């Protein structure tokens, strides 16, 4: 959890926002997935948002569903994902690592056991995509017991009550939704969310990172101009993996070319 705090403090000092890529662990196979993550960090990623392959991903658009299918095809299991997380943490001791998951994967292990395992491998935050704030008590309590930040999604139409709850229960960062619907780079992020950002600040919420539909540097800049602490980009990155599925070296080079200008756009 503390890794987010020190990251945001360092970025503030450097007058930068955070650029956070999302990928699915084990896509397209364990070895290449670890290389992808190293490449994203080398290219300037400030934190990582990682998915564990799950058979029924509700909030994911087709691009990320395909990533899950590729990981399944490679035989990747949740247990192997945790082994990967331990390796990533060993190699990169300071970068914040977040998981984006679904409740079933947490239930399968037992809620407390799941967060204990997160703590053990060095995961900093967990966002359970299909658990709304009002049903989150057992998850967020277990998370805090194990020094893992519970992350909440703030939708564009959030009312005051929801904003207060998110501010009060969330830690690490707040996942600011650019728009309603499923993830995807095709649907570019719409309106700047200054009003939500202002409200979240007023209620002392964890720093907001804008996600969903972030696929170009100008959108990263717009998110930061609207007051967000940074931006999360998933589908656009996973699409690059898909496009170069049979050319592992080209894939890594293309990821670098994509991430560098996205990170550069976070500087004011």
UniProtKB/Swiss-Prot annotation:
Enzyme Commission number(s) of this protein: 4.2.1.20
Broad enzyme group: lyase
UniProt-recorded Gene Ontology molecular function terms: tryptophan synthase activity
Entry superkingdom: Bacteria
Cysteine disulfide links: none
Active-site residues annotated for this sequence: 49 (proton acceptor), 60 (proton acceptor)
Cited InterPro entries: Aldolase_TIM, RibuloseP-bd_barrel, Trp_synthase_alpha_AS, Trp_synthase_suA
Pathway in which the depicted protein is active: Amino-acid biosynthesis; L-tryptophan biosynthesis; L-tryptophan from chorismate: step 5/5
Protein's UniProt keywords contain Flavoprotein: no
Catalytic reaction list: (1S,2R)-1-C-(indol-3-yl)glycerol 3-phosphate + L-serine = D-glyceraldehyde 3-phosphate + L-tryptophan + H2O
UniProt keyword terms in alphabetical order: Amino-acid biosynthesis, Aromatic amino acid biosynthesis, Lyase, Tryptophan biosynthesis
GO cellular component: cytosol
Coiled-coil residue windows: none
Pfam hit, one: Trp_syntA
PANTHER family registered for this protein in UniProt: TRYPTOPHAN SYNTHASE ALPHA CHAIN, CHLOROPLASTIC, TRYPTOPHAN SYNTHASE, ALPHA CHAIN
Function: The alpha subunit is responsible for the aldol cleavage of indoleglycerol phosphate to indole and glyceraldehyde 3-phosphate.
Xref: HAMAP family: Trp_synth_alpha
Self-association and partners: Tetramer of two alpha and two beta chains.
Family: Belongs to the TrpA family.
Protein's name according to its UniProt entry: Tryptophan synthase alpha chain
Organism: Shigella boydii serotype 18 (strain CDC 3083-94 / BS512)
Organismal lineage: Bacteria, Pseudomonadati, Pseudomonadota, Gammaproteobacteria, Enterobacterales
């Amino acid at each position: 959890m503390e890794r987010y705090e020190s990251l945001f403090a360092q970025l503030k000092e450097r007058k930068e926002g955070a650029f956070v890529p999302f990928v699915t662990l084990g896509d397209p196979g364990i070895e290449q997935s670890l290389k992808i993550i190293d490449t994203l960090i080398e290219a300037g990623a400030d934190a990582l948002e990682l998915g564990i392959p799950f058979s029924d991903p509700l909030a994911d658009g087709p691009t990320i569903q395909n990533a899950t299918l590729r990981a399944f095809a490679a035989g990747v299991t949740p247990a192997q994902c945790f082994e990967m997380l331990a390796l990533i943490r060993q190699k990169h001791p300071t970068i914040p690592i977040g998981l984006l998951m679904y409740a079933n994967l947490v239930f399968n292990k037992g809620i407390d056991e799941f967060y204990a395992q997160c703590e053990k491998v060095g995961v900093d935050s967990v966002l359970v995509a299909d658990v709304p704030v009002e049903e989150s008590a057992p998850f967020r309590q277990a998370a805090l017991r194990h020094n893992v930040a519970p992350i909440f999604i703030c939708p564009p139409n959030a009312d005051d009550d929801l904003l207060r709850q998110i501010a009060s229960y969330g830690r690490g960062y707040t996942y600011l939704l650019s728009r309603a619907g499923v993830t995807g780079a095709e649907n570019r992020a719409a309106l700047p969310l200054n009003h939500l950002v202002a409200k979240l600040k007023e209620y002392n919420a964890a720093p907001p990172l804008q996600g969903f539909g972030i696929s170009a540097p100008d959108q990263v800049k717009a998110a930061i101009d609207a007051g967000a602490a940074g931006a999360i980009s998933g589908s656009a990155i996973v699409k690059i993996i898909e496009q170069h599925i049979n050319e592992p070296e080209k894939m890594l080079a293309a990821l670098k070319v994509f991430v560098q200008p996205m990170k550069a756009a976070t500087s004011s």
